[in-house]
Design a protein with these regions (language model features):
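Short alpha-helical capping/linker elements at sensor-output junctions, especially the PAS-family N-cap
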Residues: 13-23, 98
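Sensory-domain boundary/capping and coupling elements
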Residues: 135-137
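PAS-family sensory domains
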Residues: 2-6, 21, 25-28, 35, 90, 120-133
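N-terminal capping loop/helix in small sensory signaling domains highlighted by a polar->aromatic N-x2-3-F motif
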Residues: 46-49
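Short acidic/glycine-rich beta-turn/loop cap or linker motifs at sensory/regulatory domain boundaries
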Residues: 32-41
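PAS/PAC sensory module
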Residues: 29, 43, 91-96, 101-110, ...
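PAS-family sensory domain signature
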Residues: 52-56, 61-66, 71-73, 79-81, ...
Length: 137
């Protein structure tokens, strides 16, 4: 591909560190999980995700995103999401989630698998949005 280097799909002169800084600075809540580890734990989250959920990195890393679920989280949507992730497929939907302080928010999420060259899922990347105002209408 013209303008790309190292076969990694990065434009010439753009480093992984540049992407990491951009993701960290983004106002869009983002999280990465590792399905190769037991219970698919969070391995990275940006500042916007921490602000949305109220968790600090050390409280979140190593834990499954289930910690955002609560008694009013829709079990049917969860089942659909989990089936997609088990199959290595993308998922898009909304869930009622719970912040660390127990308050609820509607979480609109898009989850995509990140694969290696052989097609194996290495990570799941999720971009999220607070959809609470939409649900108040």
């Amino acid at each position: 591909m013209t303008g790309f280097s190292n076969g990694a799909g990065l434009p010439s002169g753009v480093t992984v560190e540049v992407f990491a800084a951009a993701f960290e600075a983004s106002p869009t809540p983002m999280v990465v999980t590792d399905p190769r580890r037991r219970d698919n734990p969070v391995v990275w989250a940006n500042h916007a995700f921490l602000a949305l959920t109220g968790y600090a990195r050390d409280e979140l890393y190593g834990h499954n995103c289930r910690l955002l679920q609560g008694p009013r989280t829709d079990a049917e949507v969860l089942q659909t999401m989990r089936a997609a992730l088990r199959a290595g497929r993308p998922f898009e939907g909304e869930l009622l989630n719970y912040r660390k302080d127990g308050t609820t928010f509607w979480n609109g999420m898009t989850i995509n698998p990140v694969r290696d060259e052989a097609g194996q899922v290495l990570f799941f990347f999720s971009a999220q949005a607070d959809m609470t105002d939409k649900h108040r209408l």
